[in-house]
């Protein structure tokens, strides 16, 4: 997907939840507090906002989950998971989440840091690095051996950005090891590490291999067992690449303007863009890393603070999370057939919204998806959003 729409992805990330409403999510037990209840007229107004978004961007299926103070207070699927068969979307349908994966990978890294198995400023490549000389040809190109874990987390490794030659969208037949070796050998860094922000999918691919090296487990297993499972998430999976590899609960993706959702190696994107999820899954995850006391967090407060503190070069991006002064934390995702966002806000809300299409160009569907959920939340007067 090396097109101009990917180059604006980070603009979406940095501006998307400047508008975001407050949410935090996990399903609670017992009766919801009265202020959490959504009336029938309010639900109708929320649905009107969602369907207007769908009409504007020709969205087949849209699914939204919202939580407040540790309790899921709203879930609604709109439209179809499969246009051809007119199969209605359900709350359990799984979507590719694209770069909404990155907070999950960052949380996995910080879990290892918290356990003393990894250092935030450890070197990644070369003698003494976490990955040593496992990938690439020694001697490495200039600056490669200076890259640290933190620089990968903050997109300041010095190159390999998501421009027209993003390594993650080249050589689709290569596995992780081949692709990392090829990239180290053929794509020189553009800047010294730590000096320049450039959004890097490849950097998060490398972080997935760091997790595997330290934990001794495949990335997906570590994330499922040590992160998602501890949040009560059971159904998230790494996506396949083709329509034939579609899982039973997975939606069908629809490209627009000539985009093909099924010609990418999404499985290889595991740690930067490869997960499948339903909105509730993401809300459950958010609720357990949001730093609030309404639900137990899976990381210590100091660890969460380190993960969500703005980076040294770009004050709008922390470590796997876009951030602002509210402080709200969020991430969005975008590739052919997929538009996604999840948000944690300072006032105790979390949300996730997932769509099974992407419409390139302007107006920006990613920003519109963010605005849509804000508008939906503001329809509930008791939430004071």
Where are these regions (language model features)?
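Bacterial lipoprotein signal-peptidase II cleavage site
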Residues: 30-35
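Short, conserved catalytic-motif segment at the N-terminal edge
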Residues: 39-95, 117, 132-134
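Short, glycine/proline-biased beta-turn/loop segments that scaffold the active-site neighborhood
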Residues: 119-139, 230
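Short, surface-exposed loop or secondary-structure junction motifs
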Residues: 71, 78, 82, 137-334, ...
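Short, well-ordered beta-strand elements
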Residues: 339-361
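N-terminal export signals
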Residues: 2-3, 8-29
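Active-site SXXK
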Residues: 64, 70, 93-124, 207-212, ...
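Short, gly/Ser/Thr-rich active-site loops of penicillin-recognizing serine hydrolases
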Residues: 308, 360-385
């Amino acid at each position: 997907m090396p097109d101009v729409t990917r180059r604006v992805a980070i603009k979406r990330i940095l501006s998307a939840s400047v508008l975001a409403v407050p949410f935090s999510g996990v399903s609670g037990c017992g009766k919801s507090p009265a202020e959490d209840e959504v009336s029938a007229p309010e639900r109708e107004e929320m649905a009107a906002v969602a369907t207007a978004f769908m009409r504007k961007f020709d969205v087949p299926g849209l699914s939204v989950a919202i939580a407040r103070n540790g309790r899921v207070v709203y879930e609604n699927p709109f439209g179809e998971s499969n246009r051809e068969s007119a199969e209605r979307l359900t709350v359990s349908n799984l979507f590719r989440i694209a770069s909404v994966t990155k907070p999950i990978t960052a949380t996995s890294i910080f879990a290892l840091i918290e356990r003393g198995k990894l250092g935030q400023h450890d070197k990644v490549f070369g003698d003494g690095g976490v990955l040593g000389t496992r990938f690439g040809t020694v001697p490495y190109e200039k600056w490669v051996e200076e890259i640290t874990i933190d620089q990968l987390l903050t997109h300041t490794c010095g190159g390999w950005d998501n421009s027209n030659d993003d390594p993650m969208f080249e050589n689709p037949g290569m596995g992780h090891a081949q692709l990392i070796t090829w990239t180290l050998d053929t794509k020189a860094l553009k800047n010294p590490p730590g000096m320049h922000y450039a959004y890097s999918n490849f950097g998060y691919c490398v972080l997935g291999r760091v997790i595997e090296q330290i934990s001794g487990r495949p990335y997906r297993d570590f994330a499922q067992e040590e992160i998602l499972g501890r949040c009560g998430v059971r159904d998230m999976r790494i996506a396949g690449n083709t329509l034939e590899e579609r899982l039973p609960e997975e939606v069908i993706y629809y490209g627009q303007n000539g985009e093909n959702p099924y010609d990418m190696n999404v499985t290889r994107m595991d740690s930067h863009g490869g997960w499948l999820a339903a909105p509730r899954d993401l809300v459950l995850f958010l609720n357990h890393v949001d730093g609030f006391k309404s639900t137990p967090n899976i990381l210590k407060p100091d660890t969460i603070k380190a993960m969500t503190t703005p980076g040294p070069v770009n004050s709008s991006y922390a470590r796997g999370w876009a951030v602002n002064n509210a402080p709200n934390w969020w991430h969005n995702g975008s590739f052919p057939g997929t538009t996604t966002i999840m948000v944690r806000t300072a006032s105790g809300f979390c949300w996730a919204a997932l769509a099974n299409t992407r419409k390139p160009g302007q107006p920006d569907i990613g920003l519109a998806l963010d605005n849509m959920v804000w508008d939906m939340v503001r329809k509930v007067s008791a939430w004071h959003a």
